[in-house]
Amino acid sequence: MLKREMNIADYDTELWQAMQQEVTRQEQHIELIASENYTSPRVMQAQGSQLTNKYAEGYPGKRYYGGCQYVDQVEQLAIDRAKALFGADYANVQPHSGSQANFAVYTALLQPGDTVLGMNLAHGGHLTHGSPVNFSGKLYNVVPYGIDAHGRIDYDDLAAQAQRHRPKMIIGGFSAYSGVVDWARMREIANSIGAYLFVDMAHVAGLVAAGVYPNPIPHAHVVTTTTHKTLAGPRGGLILAKGLDETMYKKLNSAVFPGAQGGPLMHVIAAKAVALKEAMEPEFTRYQQQVAKNAKAMVDVFLQRGYKVVSGGTENHLFLLDLVDRQITGKEADAALGHANITVNKNSVPNDPQSPFVTSGIRIGTPAITRRGFKEAESRELAGWMCDVLDNIHDEATIACTKQKVLALCERLPVYA
């Protein structure tokens, strides 16, 4: 018999110490990694529930195991909420991650060796959009497209490449692009050659749900997303679609199970259901609106201080600082800001002279700081502190002073009150 009072702290002090140190780090550091966010205690309650004990291969009403009547209800809630939130008529909530959701779409729509157009990783794309080190670049013939001199997607070049290479699928979406994607134009280009348009909206799903960013569902054949990032749920993936036939939906389901995964993580699916319900609340819309406002406020400060922002601004939750002219590498900036308790990630910029392990830029996102209560004033103040550190990157006194300011602000605006 298992006793409910069993806990990690009394049993595994080494592990518990590391876990508690991470809790402290999250509370005492300002999180600016665009793909990270803080999920609600309700979501964590679902993830820590007894649903973790249940195996449920298959789909609601069509399981390979008995005893699934209640987890069927859980998964159906998640499916129905995902469809309602994004205006889809199909949803698969089982992918363990965004990458696995993307893998399922590839295998459902393509054959190995088929040609795909995907955004260049160095221009803001994602590993699963055709990077040679990823399955997408190894199994498929990927032709990269990119951004123009102004940091915007070059749709004319994309259209020309589509005509030249005749891909079977065009991928929209990004991991480091600060503009608004013209989904309708991308569908038009795909239609001109009879290709699928597949959109990975992982980074902007929360903004889309709140109506702050254009919804790709009416334009794409298939859409995937993660459930963390701007959506602020558990780590996991979704596949969404609208207007396809049942045959295609069955292919997508089969590509997830049994094609790519075995049993779904029912405790995570329950957490997805909670997060999707939270995303339907008016408070969530206000949160996403503030995410965008905070990003613009930070960009304004960086521009005023003479820093180069790729594309000159932001229309979503993130932006890239190009540090080439400053003769600072992304790795150096990441480390210096980290010493001041400000967490960012180094990121390649267009035409980056440095390797992906060093880079010449940093990516900055506002979902996490907004989640802990930052408004424009705090965002501008934070951007100013970051400029102080980057202007004096080897000055330990500046970094130490900034760290004290960060600690005070974190104490005033905790993640979990």
Swiss-Prot record:
Pfam families assigned: SHMT (PF00464)
Keywords annotated in UniProt: Amino-acid biosynthesis, Cytoplasm, One-carbon metabolism, Pyridoxal phosphate, Transferase
Binding site for (6S)-5,6,7,8-tetrahydrofolate: L121, G125, H126, L127, S355, P356, F357
InterPro entries assigned to the protein according to its UniProt record, in alphabetical order: PyrdxlP-dep_Trfase, PyrdxlP-dep_Trfase_major, PyrdxlP-dep_Trfase_small, Ser_HO-MeTrfase, Ser_HO-MeTrfase-like, Ser_HO-MeTrfase_PLP_BS, SHMT-like_dom
BP GO annotations: glycine biosynthetic process from serine; tetrahydrofolate interconversion
Modified-residue entries (N6-(pyridoxal phosphate)lysine), positions: K229
Cofactor(s) the protein needs: pyridoxal 5'-phosphate
MF GO annotations: glycine hydroxymethyltransferase activity; pyridoxal phosphate binding
Pathway: One-carbon metabolism; tetrahydrofolate interconversion; Amino-acid biosynthesis; glycine biosynthesis; glycine from L-serine: step 1/1
Coiled coil: none
EC number: 2.1.2.1
CDD domains: SHMT (cd00378)
Catalytically driven reaction(s): (6R)-5,10-methylene-5,6,7,8-tetrahydrofolate + glycine + H2O = (6S)-5,6,7,8-tetrahydrofolate + L-serine
Localisation per UniProt entry: Cytoplasm
Keyword Lyase in record: no
Superkingdom classification of source: Bacteria
GO CC annotation terms, alphabetical: cytosol
SUPFAM superfamilies assigned: PLP-dependent transferases (SSF53383)
Site description Plays an important role in substrate specificity, residues in chain: H228
Family statement: Belongs to the SHMT family.
Subunit structure: Homodimer.
Function, in words: Catalyzes the reversible interconversion of serine and glycine with tetrahydrofolate (THF) serving as the one-carbon carrier. This reaction serves as the major source of one-carbon groups required for the biosynthesis of purines, thymidylate, methionine, and other important biomolecules. Also exhibits THF-independent aldolase activity toward beta-hydroxyamino acids, producing glycine and aldehydes, via a retro-aldol mechanism.
Protein name: Serine hydroxymethyltransferase
Organism field: Edwardsiella ictaluri (strain 93-146)
